[in-house]
Amino acid sequence: MVYVFDIDDTICIRDNKNDLTYLSAYPIPERIEKINQLYDEGHTIYFLTARGMGRSNNKNPENLRGTTEQQLFEWGVKYHELFMGKPAADYYIDDKGISDKDFFN
């Protein structure tokens, strides 16, 4: 199976939403553990993030790629590919969507 995960407020917490560097984000270990288990079972893991798309007016999501990749590495996240540039939105409606709370509980 292929899984696509968001990053912020899904596998990490950002208490300071005004921190556009995302350096204040910290991991949610039990969620990362579940993702790593899926990876180890042979599933494909993608991350799709809106970092750099919202408050920065959709200017340069790629500017945050290095920071994001470093965080995923430091947090021990196993994945196949990181996609930057997810459009910022209040809601995402998808026929295959599931809330993070439902998935991780």
Please provide the spans of the model-predicted regions.
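Catalytic phosphate/metal-binding cores of nucleic-acid and nucleotide-processing enzymes, i.e., regions
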Residues: 1-105
